[in-house]
Amino acid sequence: MNSKFTWLDSYFYNPNLIQKCLAFLLLPLSALYLVLAVLNSKFRKKQDFKIPMISVGNLTVGGSGKTPMCKAIAKFLKKECLKQEIYIVLRGYKRQSKGLKVVKFKDEILCSVNESGDEAMEYAYCEDISCVIVSENRSKGILEAKKLGAQVILLDDAFSKFHIKKFDILLENTIRPYFNFTLPSGAYRLPLCYKKNADFVALEGDDFLRYSMCKENMKAILVTAIAKPFRLYEHFIKARACYFFKDHYKFKKEELQNLLKKHNCDTLMPTFKDFVKVKDMGFKTQIIELNIELKDKLKNAIKKYIKDSDEACKN
């Protein structure tokens, strides 16, 4: 695909007239979805796993920077909170395996990207994260993390897991959906009023800064399969051509070879999430690094939570 917006991105963030009409036609389904989501949140009893847990989530579908935020928090926990055994538990979206799987333990990666999913494999390459566990059942993943020796557990995309007692960081980005509807008429998985359930609403610019790095290379083509690829807009002019695929797309070697040949290029310019899927294909790569810097208010909130949790666990 060769557009800044996939169809879904356009539908949720920059809809044309037909997409707007479709959104209104789907409102009855959104109402049903909303009722089910609210019921799920109200009647789940919270379970305390007796270990510090930080969840990074958002209200909308698609990318919001959860992965770089989790990596930034892991780095902060290790450097400033003196926590060495930082584990992460996530679903492992679009992986070709089922059930609980330990992707990384200590410094050893234990499975392929197909088995782990691209997000989990990106975490596996993060030196600040000691263990990566994928599991559709987060509770089972948490128990496995405790058994393996976790000091702090990060939960990727777990804001909606209301049955787990945790410190919820909710990311709020500067780019917001066109409509404030829940799925399928809008991009929201939960209504906006659920922001009040978060322990910390992290506003881009106020509580964290997002930055990315990559040098210009006119012998490269930018290829990515992340949600909201327009987030990479500053890098579009750094490559000879740009190709955007659906989120979590599994790249094919021949397909990428043809794109390089078409533009007379010799280098791919992927994000790290894309890189883990193409690294064994033999291509020359120049990675776009997506990073987040935590600001003091968020750092202090995390520090206080860790301190309070450590004291509670001792009692």
For each feature predicted by the language model, list its residue ranges.
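ATP-dependent carboxylate-amine ligase
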Residues: 1-12, 19, 79, 83, ...
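A transmembrane-helix-recognition feature enriched in membrane-embedded lipid enzymes
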Residues: 2-53
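Walker A (P-loop) phosphate-binding motif
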Residues: 38-107, 207-211, 315
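Short, well-ordered alpha-helices that flank and scaffold nucleotide-derived cofactor binding pockets
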Residues: 71, 75-79, 125, 144-147, ...
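Generic hydrophobic alpha-helical segments
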Residues: 73, 138-145, 256-259, 302
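Generic structural signal for residues in well-ordered beta-strands
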Residues: 86, 131-132, 285
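Phosphate/Mg2+-binding loops and adjacent switch elements
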Residues: 94-208
